[in-house]
């Protein structure tokens, strides 16, 4: 499978990237020449990680017939101080809430571990350049 993204310069530091499923609007902060009109590229990497693992977990829980009322993935990344600034430490927090959560913790943990260890390609990419950890929280 091959993915192609076309990022077209608009003005200043403003780009519109076309990809599968729609467009992404990117821009830089004002202090580096942008106008704050869109998302920043590095945080979008964290968005991709949260989306990838989140979709895995939802799909796996559905197959396991586990219903959760609330689910969110929070990703925090710490950048290096020197250029090129890359994420060196990443933490993924999974939050689950709902009536079935207490009786389904084993299945929830299995779903998260399968995403982290087997299915989420974005998680695996992050492993190549960052220390990445995760934690599961029950609301």
What is each of the regions a protein language model found here?
Residues 1-47, 58-139:
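Extended beta-strand/beta-hairpin segments
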């Amino acid at each position: 499978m091959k993915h192609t993204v076309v990022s077209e310069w608009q003005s200043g530091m403003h780009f519109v990237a076309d990809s599968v499923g729609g467009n992404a609007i990117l821009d830089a902060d004002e202090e580096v020449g942008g106008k704050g009109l869109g998302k920043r590229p590095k945080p979008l990497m964290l968005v991709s990680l949260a989306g990838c693992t989140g979709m895995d977990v939802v799909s796996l829980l559905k197959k396991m017939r586990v219903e959760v009322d609330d689910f969110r993935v929070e990703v925090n990344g710490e950048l290096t101080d020197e250029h090129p600034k890359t994420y060196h430490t990443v933490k993924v927090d999974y939050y689950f809430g709902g009536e079935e959560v207490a009786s389904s913790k084993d299945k929830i943990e299995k779903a998260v571990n399968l995403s982290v260890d087997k299915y989420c390609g974005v998680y695996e990419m992050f492993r190549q350049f960052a220390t990445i950890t995760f934690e599961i929280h029950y609301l």
